[in-house]
Amino acid sequence: MFNAASREREPDTYTPYICHASPSGLLLDDGSLLAMLRLDGAAFETADPIVVNSMHAQRNILLRNIASDRVVLQTHVVRTLADASVYPPEQCSSAFARALDDGYRARIMSNRLFRNDLFLSVLLRATSRAGLSEGNIASLFARRKRGDRARTASPANLEQLAGIVSTLLYELHAYGVRQLELREENGLMFSERAEALRLVLTGEHMSVPLVNGHLGGAIYTDRVIVGREAIEIRGAGGSSYAVGFGLREYPAVTWPGMFDTLLGAPYRCVLTQSFGFLGKQAAQGIMTRKQNQMVTAQDKAASQTEALTEAADMLASNAFVMGDHHLSLMTFADSLDKLRAVAASARRDLAESGAVIVREDLALEAAYWARLPGNMRLRSRPGAISSRNFAAMASLHNYPLGAARGYRQRVRGRPRRLRQNDAHVVPAGDGRAAESHDSPIRQG
């Protein structure tokens, strides 16, 4: 028993979040800072392709403006079950209206209702050791315990993170963006960022209080048991099961909305993408090395060699920036039997993007925890792509949203009815009507 206890990992092993360092940032164990934004998303079903392409170009420009080798962006699309108790208790003035409302309510509530939550995380990595001042050299040899509360955030780093967040809030206003902060409820303080991180982990909504100790211990409260092909998330009310997918090879082209099928999926899932900016010199080196490898191997893909040359020229002309990209899809179900059907459907939906999909097995545990900001070391099969590719893959699309309570109700007023969006499968030809871009580097 004691040997098993010694092998048990601490809750903060993979949740490296110490505390709230400021209204805009969480402090991580390694000194990095994390800010999180929540987005309503942009409506896409009836949007004109010109508008879709314009918004894609604007996202690419935004990425170029905030590019820094210390910045990592991470997007989460969380599809989970909606609360069926949020149907507005509206009073009807006639018997016919009451009968119509009762019938409509019964029909809506007989279905499984889903909702999509979109999050954008901004991670400002700690200053490299080469950039430490002489007075801080001694800190390299000081042994720190994980989650040392004595660690403080640099005012300069906090200011830099706040500047990036301000830029994102301004440029993404069309997506209904707001910053996650602390909220007060019944005299208690809760962390919206910790709640979002827990939602990414488990696919379930739950309040996370502000604690005096390590914040990671408040986020990781369900027991995660990793098997050979699936993960069991054992909570107080029962267990749920998860399986993960990743990209083995990137698609030849990317276009805005290439993963929109998942927004209407009949299962719970979390789509995670991370993009760590690369310096121009490092990006040019990756392209040159890839091109030299193809020439040395006498690769017959002449079009790809030409595309690399063109991409290197566009990179030098500041048409885009490059970054280290990773994508994973984690699906959830209430039982292993249901998980098999969900996994088959999820793999098919993800493959509609044109990528080669692989189910995680040996790297399943790493794939599960790599979805959290700050765990980039756990990513498997990352690939270098351009900001234009990432702006297309992370399109920030969503169905129109309302709210029975909270921030959106305060802005838009009291809701009248609950409406359900039906998911429609868009033909491949229609889905690619928007502008597409070749991937300058394809994962092999």
Which positions does each model-derived feature cover?
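Glycine-rich phosphate-binding loop of nucleotide-binding enzymes
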Residues: A42, P49-V52, A57-R64, L396-G444
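Extended, folded cores of ATP/NTP-driven motor/assembly subunits in large transport
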Residues: M1-S395
